[in-house]
């Protein structure tokens, strides 16, 4: 690939498959960033189960237990294997005091030996569309095959301090003040930056981007501007979608 080759960009229509758009591999896929990680994870899980796969959704940080999915924290592999024979989609995590789930007791490696796909929310963003990682973030399993960085297009044109989790870090990466407005260039910069969304991506893992909340013409234009500033030496593909749901 040439240094300035454009990244592959995929516009999602309503009934298109996200799993196909991202070419989700068997094994571990991790979601980082802001603006729709949980929604993405659950949509991918449902699509993969419909294909006949066994899927585990989990976290290395914390998530709320998703509705309608059997949830638990088994301490032995046999328990998980048995549960997957009954229910092809499980959510695994350790119950926390605030009602959320933390990382499960079983390792991600163990889980990936039991299910066809393990989908991991590996970052938190307090429901904000954009995110810059702190020094201990994200928590991406080293065996991860695909990392998907999520950015919410509703952050564009807004003050950094209002739409970015860890806004001071986000502003610093962009060379701006927190009171300045987010541009398409800023979103692209943080997505591709090794201190931004590409932080701690395991060697050999694929790296893709979801530009979420492309709900209207203006946001779709912003998405195209972001994609045009990304090149394929850092990002494999960009998927532009409007997933709805909570971030």
Please annotate each region the language model reported.
Residues 87-89, 114-118, 146:
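Loop/turn-to-beta-strand initiation segments
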Residues 33, 60, 94-96, 212-215, ...:
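Structural motif
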Residues 14-49:
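Walker A (P-loop) phosphate-binding motif
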Residues 45-95:
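N-terminal phosphate/diphosphate-binding loop that engages ATP/GTP or pyrophosphate donors
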Residues 1-11:
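N-terminal amphipathic/basic-hydrophobic helices that include classical n-h-c signal peptides
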Residues 31, 56-59, 91-94, 118-122, ...:
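General beta-strand structural signal in soluble alpha/beta enzymes
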Residues 99-114, 123-233, 245:
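Conserved catalytic-core segment of NTP-binding enzymes
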Residues 50-55, 117, 228-241:
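Structural alpha-beta junctions
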């Amino acid at each position: 690939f040439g240094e300035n080759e454009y990244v592959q960009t995929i516009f999602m229509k309503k009934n298109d498959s996200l799993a196909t758009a991202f070419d989700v591999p068997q094994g571990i896929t991790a979601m980082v960033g802001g603006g729709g990680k949980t929604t993405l994870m659950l949509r991918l899980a449902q699509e993969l189960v419909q294909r006949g796969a066994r899927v585990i959704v989990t976290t290395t940080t914390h998530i709320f237990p998703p509705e309608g999915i059997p949830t638990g924290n088994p301490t032995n592999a046999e328990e998980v294997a048995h549960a997957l024979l009954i229910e092809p989609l499980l959510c695994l995590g350790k119950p926390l005091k605030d009602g959320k789930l933390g990382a499960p007791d079983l390792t991600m490696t163990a889980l990936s030996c039991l299910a066809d796909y393990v989908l991991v929310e590996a970052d938190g963003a307090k429901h904000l569309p954009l995110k810059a990682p702190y020094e201990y973030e994200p928590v991406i399993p080293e065996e991860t095959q695909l990392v998907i960085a999520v950015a919410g297009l509703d952050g564009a044109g807004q003050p950094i301090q209002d739409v970015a989790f860890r806004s001071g870090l986000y502003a610093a990466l962009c060379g701006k003040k927190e009171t300045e407005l987010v541009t398409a260039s800023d979103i692209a910069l943080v997505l591709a930056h090794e201190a931004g969304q590409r932080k701690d991506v395991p060697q050999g893992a694929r790296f893709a981007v979801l530009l979420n909340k492309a709900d209207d013409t203006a946001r779709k234009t912003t998405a195209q501007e972001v994609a045009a500033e990304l090149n394929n030496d850092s990002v494999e593909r960009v998927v532009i979608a409007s997933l709805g749901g909570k971030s």
